[in-house]
């Protein structure tokens, strides 16, 4: 992280926030300001309840308390923080997060109880990791792509475990990936085991903050370990040896630095994106190849299914839109309706 001193304007905002807390709060102040040093810039590399690990400009990590006035703080947030001063007994006081800078992007997921929940901030791109094992699921890739388009965060599709493919299998997978290449998505083929294809991926990650998403068992943790040069930092028991089924391996979102440049936020919250909180129109917009045909259907309320005069259906029949993508579009809509029905039933039951 480069050294960034607070500007005079930022200093004034910190002081103004402090004075406003003193004037408006009827409660006892949450922390004594005399316990802390001068404000500085930092980035949240992990969040634990009412504490956060903040990396300072010199690369050191500081455990910090969080002001009660800060309503939302997640990994990736850029913050103003103050270090704790040594206490009388010689024990260092935790630092404190004073303010959060405006986010350039925020990654969210729906929650049945809390609505939409932020899980990471200031993400430049989402790396969608898939693999031929446990299975190559284009439906899951399409779900991630809809989420990326809705969040307006750039996606990269990475197919892992290519070392397990023979020539025939590679030809088939390339044919499947051409569906995405042809509509403008970047696709990279890699192997975390043999490290084939890692160089182009490293280049795509350099200078950016990325987050890796993928179903359990695709080797996401092993791929991150290969890129980070780690063996134990991120656990690798991605798949059960007995069942072949994926296991969850990490519990808290954390930011790591790639040795070649760039950062990654590893979070269990993005193993799968729920889309049930979206409207059907948002799902439609999430399929980028549909855009040229929207508004051209015979009927304004066209469901893009069996409706007569559907421009999207005609494009599928003419080979301009991949039939697989069109089928997955309707699968996503159907699964959304089912989840919303269960949620509404649960709410009524309460």
Curated annotation (Swiss-Prot):
Enzyme class, spelled out: hydrolase
GO molecular function: GTP binding; GTPase activity; metal ion binding; rRNA binding
Keyword Ion transport: no
Annotated keywords: Cytoplasm, GTP-binding, Hydrolase, Metal-binding, Nucleotide-binding, Ribosome biogenesis, RNA-binding, rRNA-binding, Zinc
Region listing for Disordered, in residue ranges: 1-33
Essential cofactor(s): Zn(2+)
Residue ranges with Polar residues bias: 1-17
Record has Metal-binding as a keyword: yes
EC number(s) recorded for this UniProt protein: 3.6.1.-
Residue positions binding GTP: 160-163, 214-222
CDD domains: YjeQ_EngC
Disulfide feature: none
Cellular compartment(s): Cytoplasm
GO (cellular component) term, any one: cytoplasm
BP GO terms, sorted: ribosomal small subunit biogenesis
The CP-type G domain, residue ranges: 104-273
Cofactor note: Binds 1 zinc ion per subunit.
Residues binding Zn(2+): 297, 302, 304, 310
Description of how the protein assembles with itself and partners: Monomer. Associates with 30S ribosomal subunit, binds 16S rRNA.
Function comment: One of several proteins that assist in the late maturation steps of the functional core of the 30S ribosomal subunit. Helps release RbfA from mature subunits. May play a role in the assembly of ribosomal proteins into the subunit. Circularly permuted GTPase that catalyzes slow GTP hydrolysis, GTPase activity is stimulated by the 30S ribosomal subunit.
The family this protein is said to belong to: Belongs to the TRAFAC class YlqF/YawG GTPase family. RsgA subfamily.
Name under which the protein is recorded: Small ribosomal subunit biogenesis GTPase RsgA
Species whose genome carries this gene: Escherichia coli O8 (strain IAI1)
Annotated gene: rsgA
């Amino acid at each position: 992280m480069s050294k960034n001193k607070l500007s005079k304007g930022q200093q004034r905002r910190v002081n103004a926030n402090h004075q406003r807390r003193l004037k408006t709060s009827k409660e006892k102040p949450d922390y004594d300001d005399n316990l802390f040093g001068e404000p500085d810039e930092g980035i949240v590399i992990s969040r634990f309840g009412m504490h956060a690990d903040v990396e300072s400009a010199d690369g050191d990590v500081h455990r910090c308390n969080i002001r009660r006035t800060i309503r939302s703080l997640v990994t990736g947030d850029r913050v103003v923080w103050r270090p704790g001063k040594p206490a009388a007994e010689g024990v260092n006081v935790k630092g404190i997060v004073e303010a959060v800078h405006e986010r350039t992007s925020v990654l969210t997921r729906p929650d049945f109880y809390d609505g939409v929940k932020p899980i990471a901030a200031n993400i430049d791109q989402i790396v969608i990791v898939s693999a031929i094992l446990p299975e190559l699921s284009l439906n899951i890739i399409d779900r991630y792509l809809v989420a990326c388009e809705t969040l307006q965060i750039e996606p990269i599709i990475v197919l892992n475990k290519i070392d397990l493919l023979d020539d025939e299998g590679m030809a088939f997978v390339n044919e499947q990936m051409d569906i995405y290449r042809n509509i403008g998505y970047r696709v990279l083929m890699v192997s975390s085991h043999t490290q084939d294809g890692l160089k182009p991926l490293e280049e795509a990650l350099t200078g950016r903050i990325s987050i890796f998403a993928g179903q359990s068992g695709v080797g996401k943790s092993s791929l991150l370990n290969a890129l980070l040069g780690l063996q134990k930092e991120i656990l690798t028991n991605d798949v059960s040896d007995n069942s072949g089924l994926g296991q969850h391996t990490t519990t808290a979102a954390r930011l790591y630095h790639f040795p070649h440049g760039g950062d990654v936020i590893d979070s269990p919250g993005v193993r799968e994106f729920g889309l049930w909180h979206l409207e059907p129109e948002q799902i439609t917009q999430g399929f980028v190849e549909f855009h040229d045909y929207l508004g051209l259907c015979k009927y304004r309320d066209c469901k893009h299914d069996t409706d007569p005069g559907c421009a999207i259906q005609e494009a599928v029949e003419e080979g301009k839109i991949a039939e697989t993508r069109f089928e997955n579009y309707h699968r996503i809509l159907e699964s959304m309706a089912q989840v919303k029905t269960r949620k509404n039933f649960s709410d009524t039951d309460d």
